[in-house]
Amino acid sequence: MQPTTARANSPHRHPNIYRKYAFPIGNVAIEAFAEAPAIYIDFMTAPYRLHYAPDNASLAIRLALEEMGLPYETTLVDRRQNEQDSAAYRHLNPNGLIPVLETPQGPIFETAAILLWLADTHEKLAPSPEAPERAAFLKWLFFASNTLHADLRILFYAEKYIDAAQADILREGIRPRLRRHLQVLDAEAKSAPNWLHPEQPSVLTYYLACQMRWMALYPANADRSWYQLSDTPHLQAILTQLETRPATQAAIAAEGLGVTPFTSPSYATPQEGSAT
């Protein structure tokens, strides 16, 4: 993490810590001012800064930014040094979780919130608020966030929810739930709505691709045979197509994800930082 200075709401903050951007919303270029988070003394050179760790939830944000063709910069949150728990990072996200996206409107945390904000701001990778399919898209996006991803956290970090001696029992109980979640998502993908379709990437498909990648890999020291991509053929088709996208290739290069990061994933070998 970078050096700290006065907090953004402090009367002692530097009077010139403001950023001015021109960035597109729809077809209109909007100029925006944003007060810089006071924990940083440098200035962003792009309208977005992604605070990330390799192969973490920030991967979904990187993929969306790449697919939208948006300029952004990254700041590593080094998990080996527990930087997500530092005072500097908690100024951006008081929960100490990754990712955070700094924007001209301030920092955003929560993966689904960032994805939805980007999609609506830039009118890409999601149905518009006026579209008839918007309601269906929203319910499945938040299913992916509030149900699927929430249960994945229990699988990955069972010791945070129960005594360590009982962690394997908790994991065993959560796996059938995860299988059911994937089955209902696959049934929805069978109907091929434009926001859950092999030929039309969306913030939801990228989010799901990341989560399914992690199911195949983590926890590294636990049974993972319960997850079989072939059990969900319609989702498998989506993941296969996403691997051909330039956005995915950019993420592979940036985070060392291997040539088939979604359909046959390998552990990340990033140039910086650590996935765990």
Residue map of PLM features:
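Ser/Thr-rich, low-complexity intrinsically disordered segments
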Residues: 1-9
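Intrinsic-disorder-associated, low-complexity terminal segments enriched in Asp/Asn/His/Tyr and depleted
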Residues: 9-18, 40-42
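Intrinsically disordered, low-complexity segments enriched in serine/proline and basic residues
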Residues: 22-32, 36-38
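GST-like domain detector, emphasizing the conserved glutathione-binding G-site
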Residues: 42-172
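GST-like fold's C-terminal all-alpha helical module
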Residues: 144-240, 244
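Charged phosphate-binding loop/patch that engages nucleotide di/tri-phosphates or the phosphate backbone
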Residues: 251
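Acidic/histidine-enriched, glycine/proline-rich intrinsically disordered or flexible terminal extensions
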Residues: 255-276
